[in-house]
Every structure is written in C-alpha cells, then in structure tokens.
C-alpha cells in the first residue's frame, strides 16, 4: 500500500493503476442481487470462456450524520439496526488535514449483502442517493466496489481489445414505444466474422420467433461482451416489453444465470 503518493515509485503507480491482483482475462462482471455474488466472465486464450463466482464485503464512505436525524438520533435504534444489517464501522485516518476531518471520515461495511447496506440507511430515514445526502454518504455500485476492494482490473492480460469476443446488435422498430409498435428487423454481428439480419413480417408469430432466435444466437455464439448503441436504454427494454406484450415466457430466454 502506498503511504505517500509523493514518494510513490513508478512500479507502485503502475500497480495502483493496473490493479495489484494478478488475475487475468476478466472481460465482464455481473452482480447477483439475490445471491450477493459476483459473476466473473472470463475469456482465457487457452482454457476458453468460463463464468466464475466471487464475493466481496459491501462498503461505503460516510461523514457526520448527527444532523441528519438518522434513526431519530436514537443510539439504541442505531445499534439495533447495526446488528440487524451486520454493520461494522471503521474510523478513517485524517491526520491534521482539516478538509479531511470535515469529509467522509468513516468506512461502513456489512457482513451481509449490498442490499442490507442500503437498507441500513433507508430504514434510518436516509436515501443514500438523495440530494441532501450526497455529501454525507457515498455508495458505489457493487461492481465498482468489488474491483476496488479486490484490486482487480478488467481486460488484464489482453494486449488488444480486439482479442475479446464482442457481439453488437440493433433493433429496427416501427415506433419509439413498444406499446404501439413492433420490431421489424434485428441486426447481429460479432468481431469474429458472424453476421445475421433477422427480418420480421407484421405477424405476431414472426416477431415471437425472431426474439427467440435472437437469444438462441447469443447462446450459440456465447460472446464475452454484448453491446449496442444505447442498447441499455432502448433496445433491451424494448425487446423485453415486446416479449411481455406478445405473451412470451421470458424465463425461457437463455441468460447468464436464470436464477438471478
């Protein structure tokens, strides 16, 4: 651990930026909110693709909450909640720096899940992401917490990003809203030569078949990364909403972990 950044060597800086943990070939991470586990998607040049699980200790940084009416400022209620949610409090070193003393001076951890950490604050009357609390509580997403705590880095071991198997897709729709439109084309392409355009007529059966085919292709190709232009905000929600409207059983779609 670097005690003073001013005295850090080139090797220490490199280790800090690139992650000191030696594990290689992690290309993606998913967090299971039900299980509290991290799912590591790995693409090893020798062993091939695999999914491994790992755990971490959820944490956040917290400042002075004495004026926040946290659990009505009742110490007994706070301690009871700490027991319920497995909370551990660590005081951080601030030295003689006045700015640090006025900042986030506590590391809050839980022996339970990320949800328990969030619930600890919400049940005490504080929304960790609320406008009034952003300066007092900082909770990172589970994936970021895992990478920081375990000192790991994505894509370590790859000289070129093109070595990672990627798939991109795009939906063509008749409207911006799935409630009054339909999918009439799905384009799929990966960086290893696969290309497919699924054309769909105006019959519901054709759209249903195309959606199932899309997920079957993903399962067959098994790309390490799936992406698209604004896909998380448009294509994926659109796809699942159309499946719902068409009466499809989305549990039949082959995913990373059907139990999550």
Question: Where in the sequence are the language-model features?
Answer:
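The two-metal-ion catalytic cores of nucleic-acid processing enzymes
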Residues: 1-260
